[in-house]
Amino acid sequence: MALQQTVEQTVAGLGYDLVEIERSAGGLLRVTIDLPWTAPTSEAVAAGIPEPFVTVEDCEKVTRQLQFALEVDGVDYKRLEVSSPGIDRPLRNEQDFERFVGEVIDITLKAPMGAAAAGQVSATRKKFRGTLERVAGADGAPGWQIVWSDAPEPKPGQKVSKKRAPAKLHALGFVLDELRDARLAPIVDFKGRKAKTQPGFSDIDDGTNVPD
């Protein structure tokens, strides 16, 4: 069985979502998992109930089961690392985009903007960062766009004049098939980013090492 299929079936069988698989030099196999997401109810939003998050115990459980499954399939690796998504979490499907509406994301297009840039940005540009928004597509189906400003952000503690003209906003609409990569922007402010998931981590290398 292929590595992707083995890992995906094992993770799903335990009730988790597979976010990403990475194989690094030195035999490291890194698996990122998350809890299945459902849109919060209006009552939960009003009450400020946070999303559940992956814990160290979740990562340990997946690690143990993956060890067994990978051994059965004869997968060659030296170290297995299972963790929750970081602040640069990849966005893979419509549900991920729905989940993170309002967040700042980084996207990379498969092809440069070309004539569609219309002089607003470089025609060769493929990478963009902006706030993710949901929009209605031409056929009425849900669509997506990011919105950003090229104006520099005020520095911490800097006073902004009330007479200052609003910064010009740019918007880029897209469909998922146009994207090579999409991730949450790894932004941390002085107060700390509002976490969508809390870090869980489990590392196996001739034993189990689980940092706090």
From Swiss-Prot:
The gene coding this protein: rimP
Record key words, sorted: Cytoplasm, Ribosome biogenesis
Family designation: Belongs to the RimP family.
Region forming the signal peptide: none
SUPFAM superfamilies to which the protein is assigned, alphabetical: YhbC-like, C-terminal domain, YhbC-like, N-terminal domain
Reported function: Required for maturation of 30S ribosomal subunits.
Domain of life: Bacteria
HAMAP family: RimP
Single GO biological process annotation from the record: translation
Subcellular location: Cytoplasm
Taxonomic source organism: Variovorax paradoxus (strain S110)
GO cellular component, one term: cytosol
Record-given protein name: Ribosome maturation factor RimP
